[in-house]
């Protein structure tokens, strides 16, 4: 269990509780979770973070009524800056989006502006929102993470409790390499409900070469770990930076969707540009 799982800041969340579904607009349904909850134990301070990045959300179940009452549908793309005070709790996000279902808006831009305003207020940070008509995305290919997949190793694993021990002495030699590693075996659990979260991970770095077996064992150790998606990515970034000390590092996870939403956080200390094309499990 995470050290802050019972923190009072989490007590009021609708996550893990029975809730009513509202279909008329209600911004109060949105709930934020302080990023400091997991950053403080990691020694990360808001005014001196070792990374930049965003939380990229895809909204697959977004609908409202136009001014004449005709339903509209869209796919939404949201990017929340890493400097925001709060991350956005996903169940509250789903409930908030449901509140658009029977609400009339004059035009698509009013919907976009409403989302941008409410999400920014909840997160207390910078946010951008784009809405796409379905025909704009039709034929979009399934993407893949560029890099070398480390999953097909012939190793025995019998411990699934989170530990950074595997990263001790996890670099090889003195030669500096630049490579991109990929794993599809990331599985963690929701901080509150302990429901499984499934993700694919891309790690891009420059530095002494990281032992791939040790890295895979470390990633598999998240299997019983309870934390939100964004928190896991920041933990992985921080642990790799601390133990492997690369000159450059980027960590990007794309998680499978739940409740019509997928969350795709990335953190980097270089000029990393993430691909936003959905992966095969998304």
UniProtKB/Swiss-Prot annotation:
InterPro entries: GTP-CH-I_C/QueF, NADPH_dep_7-cyano-7-deazaG_red, QueF, QueF_N, QueF_type2. GO terms for molecular function: preQ1 synthase activity. Changing residue 229 to A: 6.5-fold decrease in specific activity. This is NADPH-dependent 7-cyano-7-deazaguanine reductase. Pfam families: QueF, QueF_N. HAMAP family: QueF_type2. Keywords: Cytoplasm, NADP, Oxidoreductase, Queuosine biosynthesis. The keyword DNA damage does not apply. NADPH binds at residues 90-91, 258-259. Optimum pH is 7. Retains less than 20% of activity at pH 9. Changing residue 89 to A/L: Drastic decrease in activity. Belongs to the GTP cyclohydrolase I family. QueF type 2 subfamily. It comes from Escherichia coli (strain K12). Catalyzes the NADPH-dependent reduction of 7-cyano-7-deazaguanine (preQ0) to 7-aminomethyl-7-deazaguanine (preQ1), a late step in the queuosine pathway. Is highly specific for its natural substrate preQ0, since it cannot use various aliphatic, aromatic, benzylic and heterocyclic nitriles, such as acetonitrile, benzonitrile, benzylcyanide and 2-cyanopyrrole, although it can reduce the substrate analog 5-cyanopyrrolo[2,3-d]pyrimidin-4-one with lesser efficiency. Optimum temperature is 37 degrees Celsius. Displays a half life of 28.2 hours and 12.8 hours at 37 and 40 degrees Celsius, respectively, but at 50 degrees Celsius the half life time drops to 6 minutes. The active site is at 190 (thioimide intermediate), 197 (proton donor). Pathway: tRNA modification; tRNA-queuosine biosynthesis.
């Amino acid at each position: 269990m995470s050290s802050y799982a019972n923190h009072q800041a989490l007590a009021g969340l609708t996550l893990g509780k029975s809730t009513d579904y509202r279909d008329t607009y209600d911004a109060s349904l949105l709930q934020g979770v302080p990023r400091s909850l997991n950053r403080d134990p990691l020694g990360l301070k808001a005014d001196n973070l070792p990374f930049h990045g965003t939380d990229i959300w895809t909204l697959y179940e977004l609908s409202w009524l136009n001014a004449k009452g005709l339903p509209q549908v869209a796919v939404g793309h949201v990017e929340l800056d890493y400097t925001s005070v709060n991350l956005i709790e996903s169940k509250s996000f789903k409930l908030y989006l449901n509140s658009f279902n029977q609400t009339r808006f004059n035009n698509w831009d009013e919907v976009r502006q409403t989302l941008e305003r409410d999400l920014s207020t909840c997160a207390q940070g910078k946010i951008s929102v784009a809405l796409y008509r379905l025909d704009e995305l039709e034929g979009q290919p399934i993407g893949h993470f560029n890099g070398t997949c480390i999953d097909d190793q012939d190793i025995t694993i019998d411990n699934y409790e989170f530990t950074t021990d595997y990263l001790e002495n996890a670099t090889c030699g003195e030669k500096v390499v630049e490579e991109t590693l990929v794993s599809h075996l990331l599985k963690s659990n929701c901080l509150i409900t302990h429901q499984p979260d499934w993700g694919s991970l891309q790690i891009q770095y420059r530095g002494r070469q990281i032992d791939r077996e040790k890295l895979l064992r470390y990633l598999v150790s998240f299997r019983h770990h309870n934390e939100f998606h964004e928190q896991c990515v920041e933990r992985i970034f921080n642990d790799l930076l601390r133990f492997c000390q690369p000159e450059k590092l980027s960590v990007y996870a794309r998680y499978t969707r739940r409740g019509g939403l997928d969350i795709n956080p990335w953190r980097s200390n270089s000029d990393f540009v993430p691909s936003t094309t959905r992966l095969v499990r998304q």
